[in-house]
From Swiss-Prot:
It is found in: Cytoplasm. The record marks H161, E210 as: Could be important to modulate the pK values of the two catalytic cysteine residues. Pathway: Amino-acid biosynthesis; L-lysine biosynthesis via DAP pathway; DL-2,6-diaminopimelate from LL-2,6-diaminopimelate: step 1/1. GO terms for biological process: lysine biosynthetic process via diaminopimelate. Catalyzes the stereoinversion of LL-2,6-diaminopimelate (L,L-DAP) to meso-diaminopimelate (meso-DAP), a precursor of L-lysine and an essential component of the bacterial peptidoglycan. It comes from Azoarcus sp. (strain BH72). The lineage of its organism: Bacteria, Pseudomonadati, Pseudomonadota, Betaproteobacteria, Rhodocyclales. Substrate binds at N13, Q46, N66, G76, N77, N159, N192, E210, R211, G220, T221. It catalyses: (2S,6S)-2,6-diaminopimelate = meso-2,6-diaminopimelate. This is Diaminopimelate epimerase. The active site is at C75, C219. It is an enzyme of class 5 (isomerase). Pfam families: DAP_epimerase (PF01678). InterPro entries: DAP_epimerase_AS, DAP_epimerase_DapF.
Amino acid sequence: MHIRFTKMHGLGNDFVVIDATRTPVDLTPARVKAIADRHFGVGCDQLLVVEPPGSDEVDFRYRIFNADGGEVEQCGNGARCFVRFVHDKGLTDKREIRVETRAGVIAPALRPDGLVSVDMGVPELSPARIPFVSDSDAWVQPLQLAEDTVAITAVSMGNPHAVQVVADVDTAPVARQGAEIECHPRFPARVNAGFMQVVDAGHIRLRVFERGAGETLACGTGACAAVVAGIGRGLLVSPVRVETRGGELEIAWAGPGTPVVMTGPAVTVFEGELELP
């Protein structure tokens, strides 16, 4: 089966995007892994699928698959690429759309300056709903690792995140601790591990070890979770400039019970055709 695809990225977090609005695409975990393979496939951090809406209240359905073949709830950088894709492909003439995800409805908007703003929804802070095994709802909680005990803040942006503050992201043990935190038993659905360096109250540097993908150049939901964690701990004031290895995002959050708004770029790299294995 031959399908058309578009390669896109948001701050170096790269995606293969497939239009399934007219013809369904059968994406097994093996097929996703084959497409995402950087040596034998197209190569990407995540595969994004555009599907018809499931109700009249939304414009599209948005599905996200990690490079390991697993389907996940949310991807912030992907959401920006999603709205750029459907607009550029003529699938909608709306500059702001409502999109159904496994985590709920999001509302990305294409701005006149070419950047994309996404209402990422209200962050979930209740441990049971993240999910995070804890009998406390404290903002900062200890997490025991094999060689360290780290202080983390658990946040869900539709997908789970564990954010810790580090002195310097360049020297932080992202690979070692990230892999251990991702599969920590206190996170039964696994977790994205964020390493945040606070430069000042309006600026952070961030690295994220993503669940099912490893460290990426940028993580949109990770940036949102880091800013929520930093504001909750009294370290940051909205809006916050988030510096990643792939570029910068702006994250705004007014506090508990309000949505997080993420703004950043979305870039088309190339288009092609592939044969599904």
